[in-house]
Swiss-Prot record:
<keyword id="KW-0694">RNA-binding</keyword>
<keyword id="KW-0687">Ribonucleoprotein</keyword>
<dbReference type="InterPro" id="IPR036823">
    <property type="entry name" value="Ribosomal_uS7_dom_sf"/>
</dbReference>
<keyword id="KW-0820">tRNA-binding</keyword>
<dbReference type="GO" id="GO:0019843">
    <property type="term" value="F:rRNA binding"/>
</dbReference>
<comment type="subunit">
    <text>Part of the 30S ribosomal subunit. Contacts proteins S9 and S11.</text>
</comment>
<keyword id="KW-0689">Ribosomal protein</keyword>
<dbReference type="GO" id="GO:0015935">
    <property type="term" value="C:small ribosomal subunit"/>
</dbReference>
<dbReference type="InterPro" id="IPR000235">
    <property type="entry name" value="Ribosomal_uS7"/>
</dbReference>
<comment type="similarity">
    <text>Belongs to the universal ribosomal protein uS7 family.</text>
</comment>
<comment type="function">
    <text>One of the primary rRNA binding proteins, it binds directly to 16S rRNA where it nucleates assembly of the head domain of the 30S subunit. Is located at the subunit interface close to the decoding center, probably blocks exit of the E-site tRNA.</text>
</comment>
<keyword id="KW-0699">rRNA-binding</keyword>
<protein>
    <recommendedName>
        <fullName>Small ribosomal subunit protein uS7</fullName>
    </recommendedName>
</protein>
<dbReference type="GO" id="GO:0003735">
    <property type="term" value="F:structural constituent of ribosome"/>
</dbReference>
<dbReference type="Pfam" id="PF00177">
    <property type="entry name" value="Ribosomal_S7"/>
</dbReference>
<dbReference type="InterPro" id="IPR005717">
    <property type="entry name" value="Ribosomal_uS7_bac/org-type"/>
</dbReference>
<dbReference type="InterPro" id="IPR020606">
    <property type="entry name" value="Ribosomal_uS7_CS"/>
</dbReference>
Length: 156
């Protein structure tokens, strides 16, 4: 246990265009090598594409997508007497959103569209409709937790 005091978590500043804190955090996940302006251009471009394709509020689509991607349970490795068990544990709210954002960005980068805003928009639209690679990742994580339910008594 650390002897020092617990450092308070800093709140992210809301993004300049929509004034949304979650979107600002998402931009930080998209950002590579500290290039915030590039990340902003990518995210805002993707939201514009979503707006033209679906004729809906892009922030609504974004929040739906994150909700559909965020995992409720995950497995953690726990070593008990020489054997390693995959123990299902509930995911904290902060980690849920962080994982959802990370998976959304990762699977957007793997898509085949031309530009990053188009890839991100495609993954956002798919995720908001309950399909796409990021949603599949969540289902896989849930399936692993369900398969290892027998080891849930090995709590952390």
């Amino acid at each position: 246990m650390p002897r020092r005091r617990v450092v308070a978590k800093r709140e992210a500043l809301p993004d300049p265009k929509f004034g949304d804190v979650t979107l600002a955090k998402f931009m930080n996940h998209v950002m590579i090598s500290g290039k915030k302006s590039v990340a902003e251009r990518i995210v805002y471009g993707a939201l514009d594409v979503v707006k033209t394709k679906l004729n809906r509020d892009p922030l609504e689509v974004f929040s739906e997508a994150l909700e559909n991607i965020a995992p409720l349970v995950e497995v953690k490795s726990r070593r008990v007497g020489g054997a390693t068990y995959q123990v299902p544990v509930e995911v904290r709210a902060s980690r849920r959103s962080a994982l959802a954002m990370r998976w959304l960005v990762d699977y957007s980068r793997k898509r085949s569209e031309k530009s990053m805003p188009q890839r991100l928009a495609g993954e956002l639209i798919d995720a908001s409709q309950g399909k796409g690679a990021a949603v599949k990742k969540r289902e896989d994580v849930h399936r692993m937790a369900e398969a290892n339910k027998a080891f849930s008594h090995f709590r952390f």
